[in-house]
């Protein structure tokens, strides 16, 4: 209350009213004071006054509800496009044994290091690589395997079927592979183990217009487990003592490989490709889930490919034309993360005549500005979580 009788007060709803002397109070029947609401002031929690007649109001900022993102993680969706995984997924139940879902029991300390989901996947992986019987050493691989959407590179390993892969995943996950596939490096080699990774010039095998990447000096199953890590951030620990004996026998009989050899080869490959988190997880005899890194790598790749120099390394094949800028992306990631984009890019008739001479498809989204679309694309292409919204209002 001021010296002249003026009063300031706030309501429970956060509005402020000021009681002032009515200049018409001299007229009969007119009240001496009147209340008026202070405009454009909301969410007030307290009001103050001093002996000079000045008033103040303390306003609380609106606490918005936290934004929660639901759905698959980036690593989940990338696992779904793992080139050899469609066939393995079809066999997932076929190769599951009754005891596979309860392997660990009370011995398992951490759920993330459980083999409950891994053993059926290891069975499917062995079924993909190794023939069903010793009398069928040259079993044919289904032609459906070679129709992997978006595959633009093929990995060749001695005595194994060619496996298509996505260049954007390999380049984002390993700077060594990025250097190889962009032509900056011709070959990488580990001299003690004689493991060699190189890009083969020309076309070999049944793939046309697909870049061949050769890996020699290691078993095919080691390369496929490495691919599984690059796509999923997970690891299939075939050397874990908890893996059923029949799987180990299958690898030794048909693949001519001991599970502990695979672990050693993976260490060499991880060091060669500079994957320190994978190297750290391979120090244990039992499964140790690697620290997640897919989001970090894809965030860096998404930012880098927006620069002119990034196009040479990452080779984006989609340009989203927004109202105020153009954004470079990869169709393989967009189709894996969004049914909207999958409906376009999975249709060969839609894409056939839309490729530009630069090898890109331009998608016109001129009705959308970059500011709101930035968060959508950071979620789709980089897998970022709700923390990216912390910058709102800054």
Model-assigned labels for residue ranges:
Residues 1, 360, 365-366, 392:
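Eukaryotic tandem repeat interaction scaffolds
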Residues 1-52, 57-133, 167-168, 235:
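Periodic beta-strand elements of RCC1/NHL beta-propellers and select beta-solenoids
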Residues 2-5, 31-35, 40-45, 52, ...:
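Eukaryotic intrinsically disordered and solvent-exposed regulatory patches
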Residues 4-5, 12-15, 20-23, 50-52, ...:
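Short coil/turn segments at secondary-structure boundaries
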Residues 24-34, 186-206, 237-257, 351-354, ...:
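Intrinsically disordered, low-complexity domain-flanking/linker segments in eukaryotic proteins
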Residues 82-167, 228, 232-236, 243-335, ...:
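N-terminal BTB/POZ boundary and linker segment
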Residues 152-208, 220, 225-227, 274, ...:
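Alpha-helical oligomerization interface recognition
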